Amino acid sequence: EINDFLETHGDKKNEEFCHEVMRYFNIEVELHGIEKIPKEGPVILAMNHPLGGMDGIAFISALSSYRKDIKFIVNDILLNLTNLSELFVGVNKHGKNKLSVRKQINEAFSSDCVLCIFPAGLVSRKFKGEIRDLEWKKTFVTYARSKKRKVVPIYIDGKLSPFFYRLY
């Protein structure tokens, strides 16, 4: 099924690819409070991460009609998703980041783009019967202060299958 999708839509990039994913899976998104996101200029969107890759794809698809200058700070493994890699700044989560990566991160925080971050760093988990993020890392706050970027918190409502939470 994935191969069929990629054969049909593999030529799409960035938000167009995300729109196709949303259509394929028949997913609709409701945005509330979009007016709190500036229409231009630098802003950080700090989001919970309940759905893994799908929340990022859904958010790109929905937000792209409002702003086109979207970048995500992601696990560098996701740079292998060539249809989306132009939207990503990859971070090595399991080792040191090279000087070139630190430079890219600094450039992203210095730019005027919408910079999307999942501060927990991982998909939400089930704790004592409740689905929630791991503790948010504070690094993005330090960057936001130093670069004078506004931070807008974003709540994404959703959860994965019970099977996922039994695994983790």
Where are these regions (language model features)?
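Short, flexible loop segments at the rims of nucleotide/cofactor-binding pockets, characterized by
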Residues: 7, 20-26, 91-97, 129-130
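Hydrophobic/aromatic ligand-binding patch that stacks against planar heteroaromatic rings
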Residues: 62, 107, 142-143
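Catalytic core of membrane glycerolipid acyltransferases/transacylases, capturing the structured
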Residues: 43-96
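A structural motif
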Residues: 109-122
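A cross-family acyltransferase "interaction/gating" segment
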Residues: 127-168
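Membrane-anchoring hydrophobic helices of lipid-metabolizing enzymes
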Residues: 1-43, 56-58, 67, 85
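A short secondary-structure junction signal
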Residues: 56-58, 83-86, 100-101, 119-120, ...
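A structural signal for short, well-ordered beta-strand segments and their strand-loop junctions
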Residues: 71-74, 116-118, 151-155
